[in-house]
Amino acid sequence: MAAVKLEKEVWSSRFAFLMASVGFAVGLGNIWRFPYVAGENGGGAFVVVYLICVLVIGVPVLMAELLIGRRGQSSPPIAVTNIAKENGKSERWKSVGGLGLLAAYTIEIIYSVIVGWVLWYLFKAVTTGFDGVDATIANANFEGMLRDSSIMITATFIGLAITGSVIYAGVQSGIEKAVRFMMPLLFLLLIGLATYNYFTASFYEAMSWLFTPDFSKIDGSTLLAAIGQAFFSIGVAMGGMMAYGAYLPRSVSIGRSAFIIVSADTVVAILAGLVIFPAVFKYGL
């Protein structure tokens, strides 16, 4: 296979690239997994271990993926192939990029369903609201949604259609326009909800559960959990950062960008804990 170079648009600005990259990194690993894993593995002690793993492992891997994408100037498998051929190495290295895409595809199968859940709950919030809904009713409503195949299929299809339309529009007309609106909105929502929780009694209970250090829980399994969380949360090893790197102008610093992406990703994870767990303790979920 001949080396392929993409003739394409690039990110219009460093800010647009950072917003898109943070948007790719932020996901279930931040919103759901990080607060729970931190609380179960020593609270503040786990956070320290996690931050070390992010700086020592996560940032270098992220930099490598962005560099491969920018230098290879193509999709992950072809970008890896281009670089391998430039250095006289086997084209079999393209399997590295292919495995990343396979991982992304597998995760997308899960995410597309969850996006459908979110759209359904957004519809319910606008039409009927959730006044008077306690933990028992909320659980029954959720199980009812899962049993209704028409809701699940329709909501998932709508989510995929929205995502597909954004991607089809391209980098500047699609992804950039979406993230310029959605990412600041995400941060505003998280900050607003965390501020609201600050004035509830359960906020301090959640803070204690999340951040009080318990170094007695730090062992080999905790280290593995921190490394796994770093990879899952930042979004490396899934091909996405390579793909975004392919559209990255050479004037943009990869090292500085990687540090900003990881920092923003970590802030979202911490804010998510301050949003979710005060409600968990308050309502006994």
What are these regions (language model features)?
Residues 17-24, 50-55, 97-108, 160-161, ...:
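Hydrophobic alpha-helical transmembrane segments of multi-pass small-molecule transporters/permeases
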Residues 5-9, 37-41, 71-99, 112-172, ...:
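Inter-helical loop and helix-membrane interface segments of multi-pass membrane transporters/permeases
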Residues 16-53, 205, 240-245, 256-259, ...:
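Transmembrane helix-boundary motif of multi-pass solute transporters/channels
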Residues 2-7, 11, 176, 180-285:
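Membrane-embedded translocation segments of transport machinery
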Residues 1-32, 61-66, 70-98, 249-253:
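Membrane-interface "cap" regions at the ends of multi-pass membrane proteins
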Residues 23-29, 69-71, 107-113, 230-237:
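Short helix-coil transition sites and intra-membrane helix breaks within transmembrane domains
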Residues 9, 39-65, 151-152:
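Extracellular loop-to-transmembrane helix junctions
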Residues 50-60, 101-126, 155-169, 184-197, ...:
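Hydrophobic core segments of alpha-helical transmembrane domains in multi-pass membrane transport
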